[in-house]
Amino acid sequence: MATITAAMVKELRETTGVGMMDCKQALAENDGNMEAAVDWLRKKGLSKAAKKAGRVAAEGLIGALTDGTKGVVIEVNSETDFVARNEQFQGLVKMIAQVALKVGADVDKINAAPVGSSTVAGAISDAIATIGENMTLRRAAALEVTQGVVASYIHNAVIDGAGKMGVIVALESTGKADELGVLGRQLAMHIAATNPQALDPAGLDPEVVRREREVMADKYRQQGKPENMIEKIVENGLKTYYKEVCLLEQAYIHDEKGKAVGQAVKDAEGKVGAPIKITGFFRYALGEGIEKQTSDFAAEVAAASGQK
């Protein structure tokens, strides 16, 4: 049987919002398997989490830059928020975004790209030597359309084009570029607020959908629902799930009546003067998935995990 550590309890608690003892039991029942523990809690009705969302903070900045039909979003990490507020670091992030807009989203290519008499990697090394703190280009994403716009939005901007969260979204259209730009920014703000996982149900990971279906079915069985009704209930439940995680099916935050994003985009075609198709989006939140030491919390839950 796997040893249940304080860190494991902490991660499950952050992911589900469930109490420490229930998290410990869920991990024990599932031999320390985190995903199985999440599903176990959901089947018990203790967690309403639709997906694994335990994101640990890291420092640095998200940068986003667009130029008409193309755009990029990058994440550059530092060790402390103090450095993220440093003008040299901020300038570094803006420079890397400009390079990424030219060479694309491959991190290795960005690092190898020339900057003055050096490279991006060299510029990062110079900044490390000057500022005295480790930093790295963690990831990058790019979008491009043949006609239309790529729009961006930075949430909690520290400087123009960089902050704690960044979104780019691509709109394919032959319509008015200025109107597309306004719509694109509104959509980017929506994506920042709602964190969709895919454009539509077809874009979701089939394994995620399978797990969701299985969790729902098991939950209703435990509630005593008749077997011949469960499939229909689950299908209705999946429709609700899609409205939560698929961009085109989400309730548009800029519409008071809550019409779906897909319908809002369709309605905007008259103003734009041509059909509009959202071809993709990226949403980067600072520190997604990066482990960071939180020793105080670990000490707090050590007793619940049976450690000293």
Swiss-Prot record:
Q: Where are the transmembrane segments?
A: none
Query: According to the UniProt record, where is the region Involved in Mg(2+) ion dislocation from EF-Tu?
Result: 80-83
- Name its cellular compartments: Cytoplasm
GO cellular component term, pick one = cytoplasm
Q: Which Pfam families match?
A: EF_TS (PF00889)
GO MF, any single term: translation elongation factor activity
* Superkingdom classification of source: Bacteria
**Main location group:** cytoplasm
Q: Does the keyword Cytoplasm apply?
A: yes
Q: Which SUPFAM superfamilies match?
A: Elongation factor Ts (EF-Ts), dimerisation domain, UBA-like
Keyword Protein biosynthesis recorded: yes
Function of the molecule = Associates with the EF-Tu.GDP complex and induces the exchange of GDP to GTP. It remains bound to the aminoacyl-tRNA.EF-Tu.GTP complex up to the GTP hydrolysis stage on the ribosome.
Which family does this protein fall into? Answer: Belongs to the EF-Ts family.
For this protein, the record's HAMAP family field holds: EF_Ts
The protein's name in its UniProt record: Elongation factor Ts
Protein species of origin: Rhodopseudomonas palustris (strain BisB5)
Q: What is the lineage of its organism?
A: Bacteria, Pseudomonadati, Pseudomonadota, Alphaproteobacteria, Hyphomicrobiales
What gene, per UniProt, encodes this protein? tsf
